[in-house]
Amino acid sequence: MSLLTEVETYVLSIIPSGPLKAEIAQRLEDVFAGKNTDLEVLMEWLKTRPILSPLTKGILGFVFTLTVPSERGLQRRRFVQNALNGNGDPNNMDKAVKLYRKLKREITFHGAKEISLSYSAGALASCMGLIYNRMGAVTTEVAFGLVCATCEQIADSQHRSHRQMVTTTNPLIRHENRMVLASTTAKAMEQMAGSSEQAAEAMEVASQARQMVQAMRTIGTHPSSSAGLKNDLLENLQAYQKRMGVQMQRFK
């Protein structure tokens, strides 16, 4: 796996699924391929994206700044600086300075990532802030190692939280989660349908699923009533894909 592929993988792992994630993936690909060369326009686009947390925007801004060539005097962006200040916690800043001193002696991506993984996400963000604000300088490879370690820390905590939700025994949460997943699958079917001949059938199935979810939410139902809803919808989606000759196992 190339360095930039690894960076893209880690950064995308902390972004919630949806159309915005696909858009960000495309921007990262363009930036890494040297196609998107206007940093000002890119940062303005990033600043106005909805849904993303300030820290995620800060990390993306840091990656764009590292990758896109820019003029020396280009102003640093406030939204990135604020996101990478470690919540203003002096403890994070102290740790960030110690980490920075270690990273300065490091020259490889993997070495930097290993060192960084023993620090908290707050300290890692503060260290990125030091580099972003030009208070310290490290090689691009080392900076990317720091980025990937930060994303790994964040993704780990997101995964723990997600696992807790998936394994929860609370029937109300499980019920709502099934309905949300059914809605998301319906949306995916509508997007895949496009203008094909079978599109009408796919749209019909998706529409029925949405109406069912809406009705269940409106009138309130027993928590077990949604158990088969997502599975039925996935079966319909896979049958539709087979007829279309499309294999998209990732919807499982």
Swiss-Prot record:
Residues 165-252 are annotated as: RNP-binding. InterPro entries: Flu_matrix_M1, Flu_matrix_M1_C, Flu_matrix_M1_N, Flu_matrix_M1_N_sub1, Flu_matrix_M1_N_sub2, INFV_M1. It is a peripheral membrane protein. It comes from the Viruses. GO terms for biological process: viral budding from plasma membrane. It is found in: Virion membrane; Host nucleus. Keywords: Host nucleus, Membrane, RNA-binding, Viral matrix protein, Virion. A motif (Nuclear localization signal) lies at residues 101-105. Residues 1-164 are annotated as: Membrane-binding. GO terms for molecular function: RNA binding; structural constituent of virion. Its main location: virion. GO terms for cellular component: extracellular region; host cell nucleus; plasma membrane; virion membrane. Homodimer and homomultimer. Interacts with NEP. Binds ribonucleocapsid by both interacting with genomic RNA and NP protein. May interact with HA and NA. Cannot bind NP without genomic RNA. Plays critical roles in virus replication, from virus entry and uncoating to assembly and budding of the virus particle. M1 binding to ribonucleocapsids (RNPs) in nucleus seems to inhibit viral transcription. Interaction of viral NEP with M1-RNP is thought to promote nuclear export of the complex, which is targeted to the virion assembly site at the apical plasma membrane in polarized epithelial cells. Interactions with NA and HA may bring M1, a non-raft-associated protein, into lipid rafts. Forms a continuous shell on the inner side of the lipid bilayer in virion, where it binds the RNP. Determines the virion's shape: spherical or filamentous. Clinical isolates of influenza are characterized by the presence of significant proportion of filamentous virions, whereas after multiple passage on eggs or cell culture, virions have only spherical morphology. Filamentous virions are thought to be important to infect neighboring cells, and spherical virions more suited to spread through aerosol between hosts organisms. Most abundant protein in virion. When expressed alone can form virus-like particles in transfected cells. Belongs to the influenza viruses Matrix protein M1 family. This is Matrix protein 1. The gene is M.
